[in-house]
UniProtKB/Swiss-Prot annotation:
Gene: leuS
Name assigned to this protein: Leucine--tRNA ligase
Ranges spanned by the short sequence motif 'HIGH' region, renumbered to the chain: 42-52
Family, per entry: Belongs to the class-I aminoacyl-tRNA synthetase family.
GO biological process, one term: leucyl-tRNA aminoacylation
Cellular component GO terms held in the UniProt record: cytosol
Alphabetical list of HAMAP family matching this protein: Leu_tRNA_synth_B
Chief location: cytoplasm
Subcellular location: Cytoplasm
Reactions catalysed, as given in the entry: tRNA(Leu) + L-leucine + ATP = L-leucyl-tRNA(Leu) + AMP + diphosphate
Binding site for ATP: K622
Length: 860
């Protein structure tokens, strides 16, 4: 064994061994308990970042640990390869998205291998290949036949200059990110999947997910947004149709003083025919992108349509306004306004001088003061005719019942969740498998024409999708009849909604899933990824699982038993102010810093001498130039060091602060482990451990070893507090480094301890552990070694540590049996060499003994 720890030599050797032996390739085995460990698949952006490294290290630690418990562990990896960034990169680099994507996959695959992750590479998939997306296309046509897919016009962001649709994030301050043209709202036909048909099940089954974070479940509950209320119909004077609104507060209905409709509502459109002010307002609304998040904070505007609705219970005429806070895509596009008891309605009514009528008493039973704001709390009714004196629940039911009896109301359960719009007017995605015949009939692409293959050899102009720009691509025939293919592609969330299931049978050619394999591996035992996916991906992921279950492909209700959301990786961020006042961000690697005695940064400059402003720790990002390249760190310290730091620096679900000093600390620790094994093995063969012949000190050390095994097992397996597991191993290592190694049993005990340490570290730092296991002559490869088991007998406290003082000063510590007498303790103290030298040639005048704790010898 070489004396120095050289990760650059051992890591590539061990990785080659795993590749050649196909160590992590698995198949279904009914005789073994399965464990499916999955990290969210990466987008092949070109290079791994530290967020990836953290996510995949957590997954690998769990997978390797479960494997050592004897389970059949599946840990696959693949590439979420479609998406907009590839289009931008292709235009910029004068290439096509496909070659750019495949080059990135090849590069990042090498980076993943360099980090030593134990993936089953035989199952690798890229979602941009026809072999993958063909099954998604087929499934979509099946959903269409079941009535779960439909097409309707929907508002999108439209750039009139580029003649293209923009995603919300491509609209910056109301303008196109590419050409700065003012963006318009445009209605275009789009495909939708009926996720609302599963709203109740998606909501109720959250209660089955005991091992998902509460934050994620709450976000999904709120996103689905189930509410119970009443749908109410109003007659409108001089208008051919009625107006329907939905309210969750029918108890406030007697305080409704106006209605508001969306600018795109047919009533507003009709009123605008003779109202230029309203027409201009509608125009303004059409060109304003309103994300739901902005609705609460934006200025509320409106115009009176001139129409009057009739309150069904009071008979009063109330005005109908067009307002910018009502959206056509939500509910009926009309809302009832109760300004006395809703703050938004109150602000709008105050602004435009509309009637504000209180109908709920304050908590103390007095009439509410509405001079400053609405009273939004529930309470007892007044000013409400026959409903006066009723509390919230009684009033809700009484008014709902009355409206229902009159035929103008209906109790309804509503959802905030909208159907999933899966059309994208982009090129780099899976083509939507639908065709339109000459007579306008729309139908699914026939099975014998699937997959509809996306051409990869294309020229990108950065504006129009190549398949939209090429009329020939869309031409096809169905049963001899000319037809046109759909030129929209799927939302890329489609591919990531079912990849986890395809990993169970990536080569299967008879259909989307091989049910036998899928039902052996599914559900996923632990799914690891960022909390930013809480509502979109993780909701579609659950939805798709239920769709596949109802198609008879899987037999479970939920895709993943446990969800672990890892924290973000933060790093120091620095900038200097340029000549024009702009901020130039400088990588922390290039910052020369001065720190105070507490280690805080007080001054910084770069190599060019710029004074740097330190903005603290923030999420690693391109915009702040504070990302640390994992590859550079692996080349500098080795993959094991980077992995160990990632798992030690912070609990997995908390933010992690990147500190190179911490990385250096992890590296020093691994060098100490290497050194201890080197020194131990250099002394030759080891005798068998005789547990019955151990001294008290040896028993105490062995107790520490087995207590550490018990703690680390619990920390990794149950608590998933990986940082505390590593801390416990480090603490044990400190004790082993000080332990005597002269006697035969000392060395036998050290052998047992080191074999345990190397196995406990193996999930975190597999390369060094693979090598040290061989040096310690462990049986077989460590990848197939069992996890160490704590010996209950060894952990029994049959001895205790007594502090020995001479004249009140601590001179040593001794281990004695729990039931040792004072005489035995004194005798043992005399044998301890650190104490003995203070007793040489002196007389013990007095002995103070605190049983099992302290022995103070007063000498003179």
């Amino acid at each position: 064994m070489q004396e120095q720890y050289r990760p650059e030599e051992i890591e590539s050797k061990v990785q080659l061994h795993w590749d050649e032996k196909r160590t992590f390739e698995v198949t279904e085995d009914e005789s073994k308990e399965k464990y499916y460990c999955l990290s969210m698949l990466p987008y092949p952006s070109g290079r791994l970042h530290m967020g990836h490294v953290r996510n995949y290290t957590i997954g690998d630690v769990i997978a390797r640990y479960q494997r050592m418990l004897g389970k059949n562990v599946l840990q696959p990896i693949g590439w979420d390869a479609f998406g907009l960034p590839a289009e931008g990169a292709a235009v910029k680099n004068n290439t096509a998205p496909a070659p750019w994507t495949y080059d990135n996959i090849a590069y990042m695959k090498n980076q993943l291998k360099m980090l030593g992750f134990g993936y089953d590479w035989s199952r690798e998939l890229a979602t941009c290949t026809p072999e993958y997306y063909r099954w998604e296309q087929k499934f979509f046509t099946e959903l269409y036949k079941k009535g779960l897919v439909y097409k309707k016009t929907s508002a999108v962001n439209w750039c009139p200059n580029d003649q293209t649709v923009l995603a919300n994030e491509q609209v910056i301050d109301g303008c196109c990110w590419r050409c700065d043209t003012k963006v318009e709202r445009k209605e275009i036909p789009q495909w939708f999947i009926k996720i609302t048909a599963y709203a109740d099940e998606l909501l109720n089954d959250l209660d089955k997910l005991d091992h998902w974070p509460d934050t994620v479940k709450t976000m999904q509950r709120n996103w689905i947004g189930r509410s119970e209320g009443v749908e109410i119909t109003f007659n409108v004077n001089d208008y051919d149709n009625t107006l329907t609104v939905y309210t969750t507060r029918p108890d406030t209905f007697m305080g409704c003083t106006y209605l508001a409709v969306a600018a795109g509502h047919p009533l507003a459109q009709k009123a605008a025919e003779n109202n230029p002010e309203l027409a201009a307002f509608i125009d303004e609304c059409r060109n304003t992108k309103v994300a739901e998040a902005e609705m609460a904070t934006m200025e509320k505007k409106g115009v009176d349509t001139g129409f009057k609705a009739v309150h069904p219970l009071t008979g009063e005429e109330i005005p109908v306004w067009a307002a910018n806070f009502v959206l056509m895509e939500y509910g009926t596009g009309a809302v009832m306004a109760v300004p006395g008891h809703d703050q938004r309605d109150y602000e709008f009514a105050s602004k435009y001088g509309l009637n504000i009528k209180p109908v709920i008493l304050a908590a103390d039973g007095s009439e509410p003061d509405l001079s400053q704001q609405a009273l939004t709390e529930k309470g007892v009714l007044f000013n409400s005719g026959e409903f006066n004196g009723l509390d919230h629940e009684a009033a809700f039911n009484a008014i709902a019942d009355k409206l229902t009896a009159m035929g103008v109301g209906e109790r309804k359960v509503n959802y905030r969740l909208r159907d999933w719009g899966v059309s994208r007017q982009r090129y780099w995605g899976a083509p939507i498998p639908m065709v339109t015949l000459e007579d306008g009939t729309v139908m699914p692409t026939p099975d014998d024409q699937l997959p509809v293959i996306l051409p990869e050899d294309v020229v990108m102009d950065g504006i129009t999708s190549p398949i939209k720009a090429d009329p020939e691509w869309a031409k096809t025939t169905v049963n001899g009849i000319p037809a046109l293919r759909e030129t929209d592609t799927f939302d890329t969330f489609m591919e990531s909604s079912w990849y986890y299931a395809r990993y169970t049978c990536p080569e299967y050619k008879e259909g989307m899933l091989d049910s036998k394999a899928a039902n052996y591996w599914l559900p996923v035992d632990i799914y690891i990824g960022g909390i930013e996916h809480a509502i979109m991906h993780l909701l579609y992921f659950r939805f798709f699982h239920k769709l596949m279950r109802d198609a008879g492909m899987v037999n479970s209700d939920e895709p993943a038993k446990q969800l672990l959301c890892q924290g973000m990786v933060l790093a120091d961020a620095f900038y200097y102010v340029g000549e024009n006042g702009e901020r130039n961000w400088v990588s922390p690697v290039d910052a020369i810093v001065e720190r105070d005695e507490k280690g805080r940064i007080v001054k910084a400059k770069d190599a060019a001498g710029h004074e740097l402003v330190y903005t603290g720790m923030s999420k690693m990002s391109k915009s702040k130039n504070n990302g640390i390249d994992p590859q550079v760190m692996v080349e500098r310290y080795g993959a094991d060091t980077v992995r160990l730091f990632m798992m030690f620096a912070s609990p997995a679900d908390m933010t992690l602060e990147w500190q190179e000093s911490g990385v250096e600390g992890a590296n020093r620790f691994l060098k100490r482990v290497w050194k201890l094994v080197y020194e131990h093995t250099a002394k030759g063969d080891v005798a068998a451990l005789n547990v019955d012949a151990l001294t008290e000190d040896q028993k105490a050390l062995r107790r520490d070893v087995h207590k550490t095994i018990a703690k680390v097992t619990d920390d990794i397996g149950r608590r998933q507090t990986f940082n505390t597991a590593i801390a416990a191993i480090m603490e044990l290592m400190n004790k082993l480094a000080k332990a005597p190694t002269d006697g035969e049993q000392d060395r036998a005990l050290m052998q047992e301890a080191l074999l345990a340490v190397v196995r406990m570290l193996n999930p975190f730092t597999p390369h060094i552990c693979f090598t040290l296991w061989q040096e310690l002559k462990g049986e077989g490869d460590i990848d197939n070694a069992p996890w160490p088991v704590a010996d209950e007998k060894a952990m029994v406290e049959d001895s205790t540590l007594v502090v020995v003082q001479v004249n009140g000063k601590v001179r040593g510590k001794i281990t004695v049996p729990v039931d040792a007498t004072e005489e035995q303790v004194r005798e043992r103290a005399g044998q301890e060499h650190l104490v003995a030298k203070y007793l040489d040639g002196v007389t013990v005048r007095k002995v103070i003994y605190v049983p099992g704790k302290l022995l103070n010898l007063v000498v003179g």
